[in-house]
Amino acid sequence: MASQLTDAFARKFYYLRLSITDVCNFRCTYCLPDGYKPGGVTNNGFLTVDEIRRVTRAFASLGTEKVRLTGGEPSLRRDFTDIIAAVGENDAIRQIAVTTNGYRLARDAANWREAGLTGVNVSVDSLDARQFHAITGQDKFRQVMAGIDAAFDAGFEKVKVNTVLMRDVNHYQLDTFLAWIQPRPIQLRFIELMETGEGSDLFRKHHISGQVLRDELIKRGWIHQLRQRSDGPAQVFCHPDYAGEIGLIMPYEKDFCATCNRLRVSSVGKLHLCLFGDGGVSLRDLLQDDAQQYALEERISDALREKKQTHFLHQSNTGITQNLSYIGG
């Protein structure tokens, strides 16, 4: 087994975000406002179960303990349950999570849990059904809420909910969100709107700093918790009267990248060192045979030497990320 993946800035990487498709059936305003438009990749062009098995085996050998399956919408893959099971074949991987729009959660949460899934993140940008429809292009609010309930019923002890923070859209709804998580063990994560290549106008119109919410939380008696390794870049707040927690993810905050612990592999097998980095390193030619594992590990380790200390979002440099479905956010 190789040593733990570590970059030139002594950051250790134990978390892999693995995109398995860039197809999505929602049309979120900040991601795919015009809906999914196939590029050069057909469904047959995405990583196969065997390729996923090989890439996660290599990362597990390099110290990866957590894999998050992303998209697009991962559950649109008909073999999604098989993918969960394939990742779970690696004993070193202790956590297998998914980020989903919740579209199929009510139907499939129990099956995913049985296959080995340990964590669920659901995207919910508004608790108002009409506004949810306006943001996502889908009238599925009640279906997604039922999915969150189904996740708890299936045995997931905590569900994370991702909410993209947008000025004049949902930034003023903090009290509504807090009331929702008071009786529920949900970690509600407000994510600052990030600029992407296709979303510059939206960013200028709707970006608001997460510091605004942080100040409001502190006023209301919420306590900033000591950072746990599993938090990654999130600042987590708790309150003695609430079963839920609040997380703030603020990529424009000073030193945001200092706690980076994750690498990304796209749905076509490219290693990306940063969500907003350039290029990417193709791994796919080394995912065709089990005998290639050593060479695959070497390529991953060598690529990490090029990881930059920080992103360049402050200079409006969004790198290769034209939209957030591209490499899974």
Swiss-Prot record:
It comes from the Bacteria. It catalyses: GTP + AH2 + S-adenosyl-L-methionine = (8S)-3',8-cyclo-7,8-dihydroguanosine 5'-triphosphate + 5'-deoxyadenosine + L-methionine + A + H(+). [4Fe-4S] cluster 2 binds at C257, C260, C274. The keyword Magnesium does not apply. GO terms for biological process: Mo-molybdopterin cofactor biosynthetic process. Residues 8-234 form the Radical SAM core domain. Pathway: Cofactor biosynthesis; molybdopterin biosynthesis. Its EC number is 4.1.99.22. GO terms for molecular function: 4 iron, 4 sulfur cluster binding; cyclic pyranopterin monophosphate synthase activity; GTP 3',8'-cyclase activity; GTP binding; metal ion binding; S-adenosyl-L-methionine binding. This is GTP 3',8-cyclase. It comes from Salmonella paratyphi C (strain RKS4594).
